[in-house]
Amino acid sequence: MKLKTNIRHLHGSIRVPGDKSISHRSIIFGSLAEGETKVYDILRGEDVLSTMQVFRDLGVEIEDKDGVITIQGVGMAGLKAPQNALNMGNSGTSIRLISGVLAGADFEVEMFGDDSLSKRPMDRVTLPLKKMGVSISGQTERDLPPLRLKGTKNLRPIHYELPIASAQVKSALMFAALQAKGESVIIEKECTRNHTEDMLKQFGGHLSVDGKKITVQGPQKLTGQKVVVPGDISSAAFWLVAGLIVPNSRLVLQNVGINETRTGIIDVIRAMGGKLEITEIDPVAKSSTLTVESSDLKGTEIGGALIPRLIDELPIIALLATQAQGVTVIKDAEELKVKETDRIQVVADALNSMGADITPTADGMIIKGKSALHGARVNTFGDHRIGMMTAIAALLVADGEVELDRAEAINTSYPSFFDDLESLIHG
């Protein structure tokens, strides 16, 4: 598709879609709880719809009516063997978390996904689950999907140090630990997003968190709840950057989730000199209103414990860095290589084709700014975040056209993205 270019200003206020991580988990917890769960403001992107369909296939009654998702929970042991293989679509979150959920189910399942998911390594989750007594295997030594899994009613607790910082693996092991008899201890390499921990407590579960150490005593029962999903800061990130780099702009983003494990992008914007204001903070929902204005930016260094707090925002942060004076270094982000695409290479290739100066490294990028961007043809390779990054980059292009191939990938997390963009262009 042909993208909008040469935009002189952006103005307006929008409410970004519901948080993808919280939306996935609300369906999982609601299904495993006893009683009814109602979920408000859920993200209806393709990944979350995949999770919803998988639990329907596992025998859970889920109704989507009048904007509210109602889940009739079946309890920790109530899932039923599906008639067919479970389709995870493009969703790494779905296949990894649900592997942990099914660890205690006494039936065999096959889980598969699209071409992109079929290239993503699952050994990070299959190895610890095998230690707990689960029979699980995929293709090649990296256990690529499709996966075959047979759970066990005699799940063993685990003491496991994560070799990588991964909220998905941590969460999969927590779901398994809830079904194992005894104490499981999970030790993170770096602190990652803690939505599973927060929601476990909300649904009446128990755990203790001491720094990077999480202890779960199993088995446990959960009770249905009301969940209100805040806006997704990973989706808001595209507008935060757009408001900072498009001249004469001021954008107001309402109801954005600001869980402290997800706000790395706010730290980076401030380090780069961006004008960003946080107001209307709701400490219970962990949400707020974020306002940004066009800013003169400077390069910075991004690495270490900051990376898990902004891993999904790094593509759009790379674009931000192309518009900052000086050098920005992103390091310790090798995890980007096993996202929907190799995001280190794909981001560098896409933005360099538009005139940026980015050198990919083994664990990140070196970005020299400030760069004037020009027209190009960019392929998302099925990666939603590459698509949205390119659409924001195109706004700065004064010379030539920007063509985006496979733009439909954006529906993974933000089906209304282009509608919201139009409203801000005309705001």
From Swiss-Prot:
Under Gene3D superfamilies, the record lists: Enolpyruvate transferase domain (3.65.10.10)
Positions of 3-phosphoshikimate binding = K20, S21, R25, S166, Q168, D312, K339
**GO cellular component term of the entry, any:** cytoplasm
InterPro entries the record matches: Enolpyruvate_Tfrase_dom, Enolpyruvate_Tfrase_sf, EPSP_synthase, EPSP_synthase_CS, RNA3'P_cycl/enolpyr_Trfase_a/b
Q: What pathway or pathways are given for this protein in its record?
A: Metabolic intermediate biosynthesis; chorismate biosynthesis; chorismate from D-erythrose 4-phosphate and phosphoenolpyruvate: step 6/7
- At which positions is phosphoenolpyruvate bound? K20, G92, R120, Q168, R343, R385
For this protein, the Enzyme Commission number is 2.5.1.19
List the catalytic residues.
D312
Which SUPFAM superfamilies does this UniProt record tie to the protein? Answer: EPT/RTPC-like
Intracellular or extracellular location(s):
Cytoplasm
Q: What class of enzyme is it?
A: transferase
Provide one Gene Ontology biological process annotation. aromatic amino acid family biosynthetic process
Gene Ontology molecular function terms on file: 3-phosphoshikimate 1-carboxyvinyltransferase activity
Coiled coil stretches, renumbered: none
Protein keywords: Amino-acid biosynthesis, Aromatic amino acid biosynthesis, Cytoplasm, Transferase
What Pfam families has UniProt attached to this entry? Answer: EPSP_synthase
Report which reactions are catalysed by this protein.
3-phosphoshikimate + phosphoenolpyruvate = 5-O-(1-carboxyvinyl)-3-phosphoshikimate + phosphate
Classify the main location.
cytoplasm
Q: Tell me, how does this one assemble?
A: Monomer.
Give the matching HAMAP family: EPSP_synth (MF_00210)
Q: Which family does it belong to?
A: Belongs to the EPSP synthase family.
NCBIfam families membership: aroA
Protein task: Catalyzes the transfer of the enolpyruvyl moiety of phosphoenolpyruvate (PEP) to the 5-hydroxyl of shikimate-3-phosphate (S3P) to produce enolpyruvyl shikimate-3-phosphate and inorganic phosphate.
This protein is called 3-phosphoshikimate 1-carboxyvinyltransferase
